[in-house]
């Protein structure tokens, strides 16, 4: 045990030690250590997680005859239920694509997709700032990979040109909305690049965009009218949609490859049908939340301006607003100060973000009021 204790002590000395907090949730507020705070760190972007009317409508819809609370098995064995197919068909229909496939989480999706669709003769080109789950999936793929500079498409093009004809297939991998900086990939440029090179596929993670952007809440790909051009469009139900699980939208051939070769799908007990039914209920209503999306954008634009006055770096274009302070100690101190003022703000440190870019990741939700965000900005 000595070596493990030393590792923990080293993390503590670097202000990188983590622990799981004890929290009580009350709508958009969180209570921690008897301190009630406005939650400025949530991914509940549309504010649906605590919407009692939605919850009541969902429960009344089933009248006590609820779907099973467990699947008890992988979908490929005895764990498949009609509600899974219903949701996949709904997702595919809304995206106007051939097929969709459900996963237990965004992490499961990103961990398993690339290993299932690549060989040792393949190439992966990933944005430098893609999520840790995508990096883990890339590592498990056991194929060649390079990380192009963040949103630097000249660098990406250079890598594509250097590797023409060397691999059986190439995957370009990116997020649409980046989870730590809140900036947005140029999907149009990525689609254009993909088309210039043979056997090249585009894989976009919309975890922080689904529900929030696009006329129907289908993400940046919908906003930019590019859904049909993206080979693998992945998103999560656990953020703006206030549920659990994830999906991939793709063609039928890729779906069947994933069903046959994706280990996290094949060897995991499927999500409880009850949760999938709740996801269906929310996803079906996604186009109806345009007022929430509009209000969230107004709040986000205001907070981005306020934070930009106080930091040298403001990459955000979304409701994820990084307040970059640099060092771990300063970031921890600022987070503690804001919590004392009644705002649940959390420090983000390396290795989650690059060294010397420690920050408070501010995340807005549509159930916040304009006055609440103004008062928070004054505390900064």
Swiss-Prot record:
Cite the Gene3D superfamilies for this sequence.
Aspartate Aminotransferase, domain 1, Type I PLP-dependent aspartate aminotransferase-like (Major domain)
* A GO molecular-function annotation: pyridoxal phosphate binding
Binding of pyridoxal 5'-phosphate: at which residues? 106-107, 179, 205-208, 236-239
Report the SUPFAM superfamilies cross-referenced here. PLP-dependent transferases
Q: What Pfam families does the annotation carry?
A: Aminotran_1_2 (PF00155)
CDD domains referenced in this protein's UniProt entry, alphabetically: KBL_like
Q: What pathway annotation does it carry?
A: Cofactor biosynthesis; biotin biosynthesis
**What does the entry list as the binding residues for substrate?**
18, 131, 352
Enzyme nomenclature, EC number: 2.3.1.47
Picking any one GO biological process from the record gives: biotin biosynthetic process
- Reactions accelerated catalytically: 6-carboxyhexanoyl-[ACP] + L-alanine + H(+) = (8S)-8-amino-7-oxononanoate + holo-[ACP] + CO2
Which family, according to the similarity comment?
Belongs to the class-II pyridoxal-phosphate-dependent aminotransferase family. BioF subfamily.
The record describes its quaternary structure and partners as: Homodimer.
Primary role: Catalyzes the decarboxylative condensation of pimeloyl-[acyl-carrier protein] and L-alanine to produce 8-amino-7-oxononanoate (AON), [acyl-carrier protein], and carbon dioxide.
Question: Protein name, please?
Answer: Putative 8-amino-7-oxononanoate synthase
What organism is the protein native to?
Neisseria meningitidis serogroup B (strain ATCC BAA-335 / MC58)
